[in-house]
Amino acid sequence: TRKESSAASDVYKRQRKTAAAGVQVPPDLLYAYFRLSGRSRVLKAGSYEIPRGSSPEYLLDMLAEGRQAVRSVTLVEGWTFRQFREALARADHLKQDTTGLSGPEIMTRLDHDGIAPEGRFFPDTYVYPKNSSDLGVLRQALQAMDRRLEAAWSVRAPDLPLQSPEQALILASIVEKETGLQADRGQIAGVFANRLRIGMPLQTDPTVIYGASEAQGVAFEGRLRRIHLDTDTPWNTYTRPGLPPTPIAMPGNAAPVSYTHLRAHETKAN
């Protein structure tokens, strides 16, 4: 059985919690032990889970090293920003500081004002201390995607028909939704790169689906029909040439090589 003890540097004032955790030392003596150890000033505040029967030495090491109770949340490749937010809302012991905020408002809080949130967060498993803010997890994912996008853009092919890292991210998201197979991504990206080069519409179903659903804040239901293909939206790559205005999903780690470092024979695909 584990009991939670918070505010590590205030153990003396939290005698009941320490005793409930099963540390078999009177609180006054425990406090004195911490002071005499010479490490009392390095104890780290936070949320801790203390195993019942812990020794003073174990407890001191735990608090000095900041081994807080942590939880994790997994954000999956190919998810949309809406799905990311739903996963964060379900996460254990994660404060919901973004409740009621729009996507643009969240990006402003994350110091990315004016940037669309779709596609900007790297899918991965994120570990966080209990009772952290969901904004903290989003910031981790945002910074992780920024780093990967910058690295991929720095080694892009010289003749790539893309003008900015943002366009590369948009193309990466389309490739992500087109296939889950890493081996196919280069060929698919090559097809799209060639179409962009000659001004041909990309004609890819995932963008149509996004424009008919996620762009409106809802999940897509049913099957893709002719009416969807014929209905013009900024994301309909059948009715409009070029890239859509935003990514359509969160591309994973394998995507950057596919959309920024195409081999010559791939860019000749049609």
Labelled PLM ranges:
Residues 1, 38, 158:
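Short, flexible, glycine/charge-rich loop motifs used to bind or transfer phosphoryl groups or to couple energy/partner
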Residues 1-8, 12, 261-264, 268-270:
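Single conserved hydrophobic/aromatic residue that forms the stacking wall/gate
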Residues 4, 77, 176-178, 266:
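Acidic-residue sensor for enzyme active/binding pockets
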Residues 9-152:
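Signal peptide-directed extracytoplasmic domains
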Residues 86, 92-95, 108-263:
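Bacterial extracytoplasmic/cell-wall-associated proteins, especially those involved in peptidoglycan
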